[in-house]
From Swiss-Prot:
Main localization (coarse): cytoplasm
GO cellular component: cytoplasm
EC number: 5.3.1.16
Gene3D superfamilies: Aldolase class I (3.20.20.70)
Name of the protein: 1-(5-phosphoribosyl)-5-[(5-phosphoribosylamino)methylideneamino] imidazole-4-carboxamide isomerase
Compartments (UniProt record): Cytoplasm
Keyword Cytoplasm listed: yes
Similarity annotation: Belongs to the HisA/HisF family.
Catalytic activity: 1-(5-phospho-beta-D-ribosyl)-5-[(5-phospho-beta-D-ribosylamino)methylideneamino]imidazole-4-carboxamide = 5-[(5-phospho-1-deoxy-D-ribulos-1-ylimino)methylamino]-1-(5-phospho-beta-D-ribosyl)imidazole-4-carboxamide
GO molecular function: 1-(5-phosphoribosyl)-5-[(5-phosphoribosylamino)methylideneamino]imidazole-4-carboxamide isomerase activity
Pathway(s): Amino-acid biosynthesis; L-histidine biosynthesis; L-histidine from 5-phospho-alpha-D-ribose 1-diphosphate: step 4/9
Catalytic residues of the enzyme: D8, D129
């Protein structure tokens, strides 16, 4: 099981949003690169980095900072936010990002998404961000009108390497993972599935762990909980290693 600590970047700072709302922001550090190193030092095997400015604007906004984070770390980085053309994808991969998370393009520009998967095999994943069962785009501010069932077969056929499932209703709310929705999605996915939204305590990690042994669930992204201290990342990593 992999726990992915989240480093969300907005205005050059490390922040967390509640339910993706830009007006519900908490700043946790003025130095995202130092924060990324801290999570690596705590035992993280991967980092989950989101360019929130890019997600809202549709173009990269923190490229140099993200390049520096990748250069500083010895663990791989997965990155999302504002990746909406091939040139941006290539630039980030060349800068040291291990794999890319595509959201808006995957739903709105299927031909471009398929081309990204073909051009960078094994390195392109999709973020399915659901609120009330409907998928959101453009930094979670637009309703696509689509559901997971509508889009998943096409995304898998295109060559999706991994799937991140965000339950927006639980994002930043620290209410536990939506295990039933995750289990249903994993049953439809032959590629790794990563849960996002709701991981708040070691109990949530323990509840999710069995699913990583019996399904395609690879792990979970954790954000607010490790910043506020309701989840001790180092202790969680040690618990996983002991299983």
């Amino acid at each position: 099981m992999i726990l992915f600590p989240a480093v969300d970047i907005k205005d050059g700072r490390c922040v967390r949003l509640r339910q993706g709302r830009a007006d519900a922001e908490t700043v946790f550090s003025d130095d995202p690169a130092a924060m990324a190193r801290h999570w690596q030092d705590q035992g993280a095997k991967w980092l989950h980095v989101i360019d929130l400015d890019g997600a809202f604007s549709g173009m990269p906004a923190n490229f140099e900072l993200i390049r520096r984070i990748c250069a500083d770390l010895s663990v791989p980085v997965q990155l999302g936010g504002g990746i909406r053309d091939e040139a941006t994808a290539k630039a980030y991969l060349d800068a040291g990002v291990e794999r890319l998370i595509i959201g808006t393009v995957a739903l709105e520009e299927p031909d471009l998404y398929a081309r990204l998967c073909a051009t960078f095999p094994g390195r392109i994943g999709v973020s399915l961000d659901a609120e009330g069962g409907r998928l959101k785009t453009k930094g979670w501010v637009a309703d696509s009108g689509l559901t997971v069932d509508d889009v998943l077969p096409r995304l898998l056929a295109a060559g999706t390497a991994f799937v991140i499932y965000t339950d927006i209703d639980r994002d930043g709310m620290q209410t536990g993972v939506n295990l039933s929705a995750l289990e249903r999605l994993a049953g439809m996915c032959p590629v790794p599935v990563i849960a996002a939204g709701g991981v708040a305590t070691l109990e949530d990690v323990r509840a999710l762990y069995p699913m990583t042994l019996t399904s395609s669930v690879e792990g979970a992204i954790t954000g607010r909980a490790i910043y506020t201290g309701t989840l001790d990342l180092h202790a969680a990593m040690e618990w996983i290693a002991a299983q």
